[in-house]
Amino acid sequence: MGLEISEEKIKSILPSTRYQGSKRKMSPWIYESLRKLDFDTVLDGFGGTGSVSYLFKMMGKKVTFNDILLSNYQTGIALIENNKIELHGDDVNYLIHENGFDYPSFIQKIFKDIYYLDNENVWLDIVIHNIYMLSEKYEGDVLRKKQALAFHALFQACLSKRPYNLFHRRNLYMRTANVQRKFGNKKTWDTPFDALFVKFCKEASDKVFSNKRRNIANCKNILEMKGERYDLLYLDPPYIRSKQDMPADYRSLYHFLEGIMDYYHWEEKIDYTKKNKPLIKNKRLWDKDSIEANFDNIFNNFQDSIIVLSYGDPGYPSVETIKELLYSYKNKVKIKKKEYTYKLNHSGKNGTKSYEVLIIAQ
């Protein structure tokens, strides 16, 4: 049955995030819905911010975090796989200062006036290079986990300084325009990058703990994961919300963070025809034509596991369609709903309620 954890403890312990679609706020409800299920090993197939994986880790489960994005994979290493490595004061000091290296100026040149101020772009080029150059101080697993903590902290700082916490358009003017604002956190936008980074380095290190299990972080396409056995599969996949034609493309929304993860080859992978300089698009694995077949493929591959799906209603495919797909492999399918409004989702104004849904199939 696992450990009993209070709602207050869950809310206070889970790492903060500025990632769109994070289940952090829903975690107490997810915990209450799943805590009586009989499982020990769990795969979080679309790990994202790591909130639900971290919850499972708190519950004492053996957790495998998986996400296809390299930036999210770093969070999985830092907070799920990592049981003891932290960033110490001398590490952070090394990361935020120039250390005599021949620093690149890639972000300063390519992303001028797009996402950050000039001095912030200089800072980013220095800190990113320093994170990679932690290899001068560490090696092996210690290096891997210290770099992951640093990248995780950097990504949180980067998101904090972005309007909507995204990289979907060239909108630096929203920070710099001298206008009355009804939204946005101007105080955070005006906070120096290094202050935000130091704060998130400390927070990330404070969140490192051991649940005495060998937890793992992967960076795989879940559609290709076959033959792996877990007691429970948790899915928070891309899906099509009401009135949308396509599921959210997280690689496009967070392309800047993905670019950082391939910093020294980033220049070769940019679509220079677009004003906001995103990465050249990959073939989409999740679209309106493939989404139903993708669900069926995953349910088939993991039919021996308890399958738990975080979903939205209204959405496409519908909850009823998902339920019918699951009945091809499972005898019992339970639906739980909770009314919820996302910050950037205003559909409730026209009388249409949105629900967070948990589909539990055994």
Protein language model regions, located:
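SAM-dependent nucleic-acid methyltransferase catalytic core
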Residues: 7, 115-249, 264-277
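Conserved Class I SAM-dependent methyltransferase catalytic core
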Residues: 278-330, 337-338
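S-adenosyl-L-methionine
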Residues: 1-43, 51-58, 82
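Conserved proline-anchored active-site loop of SAM-dependent methyltransferases
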Residues: 30, 42-56, 65-72, 227-247, ...
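SAM-dependent methyltransferase catalytic-core segment centered on the flexible catalytic loop
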Residues: 240-304
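Class I S-adenosyl-L-methionine
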Residues: 319-323, 329-362
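SAM cofactor-binding core of SAM-dependent methyltransferases
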Residues: 41-112, 125-132, 148-151, 155, ...
